[in-house]
């Protein structure tokens, strides 16, 4: 799975670029801050439980935006809550990523037409990198979204903009269920 799993045979030297080292360190140690606002937060909590165990992916939840590099917005964002979402986003250090989880944070959900108090997508107030659809999305979907964030980090380069990395990411597809099964098989062995 990792760089050293295959073993280093002769000279014990690994040659790589600065981009690869920085991206490997960032994607192997994501620190998300969950911003749970509705029923999607329950699925986010289930993802952190022992059945799915996000820590095996190097993902350690944080409660402070100053320690986080990923914000997971899960649930219905109201107009009053939008100001707090922006404030928390601004408190996060660079590079920072946002994952929008669920129909409500993606586009307003079932409240989009008649809910005057509901923001019609969190992307209207902060930039979103990855969208996870569903009402509420299953933990496997959230893990798939987190893997998309890791792929986005892997594709970033010093001279490449975030928009270009997002275009590259849109061309790739990841099956989260196969990755979960792969990790379970490794854990059993």
UniProtKB/Swiss-Prot annotation:
Give the catalytic activity.
a quinone + NADH + 5 H(+)(in) = a quinol + NAD(+) + 4 H(+)(out)
Cited Gene3D superfamilies: 3.40.50.12280
Quick check: keyword Membrane in the entry? yes
Enzyme nomenclature, EC number: 7.1.1.-
Q: Note how many cofactor molecules are bound and how.
A: Binds 1 [4Fe-4S] cluster.
Keyword Lyase recorded: no
Where is this protein localized, as stated in its record?
Cell inner membrane
What molecular function does GO assign, one term? quinone binding
A matching Pfam family: Oxidored_q6
SUPFAM superfamilies referenced in this protein's UniProt entry, alphabetically: HydA/Nqo6-like (SSF56770)
Give the UniProt entry's GO cellular component terms: plasma membrane; respiratory chain complex I
GO biological process annotation, one example: aerobic respiration
Record family assignment: Belongs to the complex I 20 kDa subunit family.
| Task of the protein | NDH-1 shuttles electrons from NADH, via FMN and iron-sulfur (Fe-S) centers, to quinones in the respiratory chain. The immediate electron acceptor for the enzyme in this species is believed to be a menaquinone. Couples the redox reaction to proton translocation (for every two electrons transferred, four hydrogen ions are translocated across the cytoplasmic membrane), and thus conserves the redox energy in a proton gradient.
Q: How does it assemble?
A: NDH-1 is composed of 14 different subunits. Subunits NuoB, C, D, E, F, and G constitute the peripheral sector of the complex.
Task: State what protein this is by name.
Answer: NADH-quinone oxidoreductase subunit B
Taxonomy, top ranks, is: Bacteria, Pseudomonadati, Chlorobiota, Chlorobiia, Chlorobiales
């Amino acid at each position: 799975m990792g760089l050293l799993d295959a073993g280093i045979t002769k000279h014990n030297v690994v040659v790589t670029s600065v981009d690869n080292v920085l991206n490997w360190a960032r994607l192997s140690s994501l620190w998300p801050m969950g911003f749970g606002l509705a029923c999607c937060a329950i699925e986010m909590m289930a993802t952190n439980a022992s059945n799915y165990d996000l820590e095996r992916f190097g993902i350690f939840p944080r409660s402070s935006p100053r320690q986080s590099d990923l914000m997971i917005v899960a649930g219905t964002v109201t107009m009053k809550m939008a100001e707090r979402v922006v404030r928390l986003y601004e408190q996060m250090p660079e590079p920072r990523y946002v994952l929008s989880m669920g129909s409500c944070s993606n586009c307003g959900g079932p409240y989009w037409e008649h809910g005057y108090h509901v923001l019609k997508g969190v992307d209207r107030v902060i930039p979103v990198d990855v969208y996870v659809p569903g009402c509420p999305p299953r933990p496997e979907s959230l893990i798939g979204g987190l893997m998309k964030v890791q792929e986005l980090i892997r594709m970033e380069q010093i001279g490449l903009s975030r928009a270009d990395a997002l275009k590259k990411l849109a061309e790739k597809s990841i099956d989260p269920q196969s990755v979960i099964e792969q990790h379970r098989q490794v854990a059993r062995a």
